[in-house]
Amino acid sequence: MECKMSFFKYRVMKRLFLFAVCAWAGLSLWASSVKGQGTACETRSEKVPAKVYMIKEISPENLMKVYEALGRKATGKVAVKLSTGEPGNNNYLDPALIKGLVQKVDGTIVECNTAYGGGRSDTEKHLKAAKDHGFTAIAPVVIMDADGEVSLPVKGGKHLKEDFVGKAYPEYDFTVVLSHFKGHPMGGFGGAIKNISIGIASSSGKAYIHSAGKTKSVKEVWGKLPPQDDFLESMAEAAKAVADHCGDRILYI
């Protein structure tokens, strides 16, 4: 039974990882399309077609090959953004898969608290979930909104004028975004865009995105949900705020 379960988990991980690579490619293309608006920390002055790198087998070694192929080195104080996963849920990246990459870039795994009940709605419970899922065994884990939030400007936003992220996020020099494919009741599915928009947003910032800018209250948000398109556009606007903040100091896997 254990052997069968391991094989099943491998097949699922393989499919999720390939979806994540595709999500990275989509985000790269999207970022290229908005690059012309310019930011203080961007260095590229022209659009460059995104390259998509695929691997046939999911392994720590091949994950490193993907990182090397991107040609962008994570330097300075590095944040590794991933989803720690709800307690009792096994739909998160296997720490054994990402350990080599996280430690190579000397990264800190970062997350923010959720805007719903669950097991990650406060810092104490969230850190326990991260420990139970094996993330604290491979790297430091920081819940970025443990001490509050800061805002990033949303340039040209239709619904949002600012994006409220964990207070600790601006302390990092570089962001490595590790995403996996997962379902989302409002978005259909989640990937890299969700990972850096809702994922980097503080708990109240998550409420702000989900409500398309109507409220920051985690108690009120679920009664003030906007049309789906407004939510999706707000999620993209929040992702753009993070991408603008980072410029070239971010990569997606």
Predicted regions and their residues:
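Extended, low-polarity segments enriched in aliphatic/aromatic residues
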Residues: 44-82, 86-99, 104-253
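Bacterial Sec-dependent N-terminal signal peptides
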Residues: 8-38
